[in-house]
């Protein structure tokens, strides 16, 4: 799906929910959908302010909350008190491993896990709307640091 199509889908959804489609909100959505890494709300704010210094923190946070509630972005608690987001519209499904020490997020996809989740849902007659798998632990770099080794 093209970025313009993604933005139109989000715009229509927000308008249907009674939100005004302002220049700031359009910029926030464009930046969030155009970011292909895991970002914090403050990182998104900085990216938006680079394009328009008038973008408000409150509008970024409100817009992210609406985007998350609608399923256009997914919020990930990093285990260190932080929260990172990624846009999911137009992306292949994948899962995450989150380092509870440094907050780094690793994406992965495992066909066997997918197969087992589908079988579990089928076994109990459950229709899956969306699913997420987050594995929390300690990454290799932080494990080495804990042992006093160089990363």
Model-derived segments and spans:
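Pre-recognition alpha-helix immediately N-terminal to the DNA-recognition helix
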Residues: 26-31
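Basic amphipathic alpha-helical segments that dock to polyanions
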Residues: 60-70
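A short acidic, leucine-rich amphipathic alpha-helix
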Residues: 43-49
């Amino acid at each position: 799906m093209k970025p313009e199509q993604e933005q139109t889908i989000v715009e229509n959804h927000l308008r249907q929910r009674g939100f005004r489609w302002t220049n700031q909100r359009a910029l926030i959505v464009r930046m969030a959908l155009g970011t292909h890494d895991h970002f914090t709300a403050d990182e998104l704010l900085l990216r938006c302010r680079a394009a328009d210094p008038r973008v408000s923190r409150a509008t970024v946070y409100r817009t992210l909350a609406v985007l998350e509630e609608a399923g256009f972005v997914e919020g990930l608690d990093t285990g260190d008190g932080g929260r990172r987001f990624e846009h999911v519209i137009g992306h292949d499904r994948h899962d995450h491993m989150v380092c509870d020490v440094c907050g780094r997020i690793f994406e992965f996809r495992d066909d066997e896990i997918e197969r087992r989740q589908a079988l579990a849902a089928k076994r109990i007659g459950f229709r899956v709307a969306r699913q997420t798998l987050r594995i929390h632990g300690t990454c290799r770099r932080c494990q080495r640091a804990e042992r006093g080794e160089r990363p």
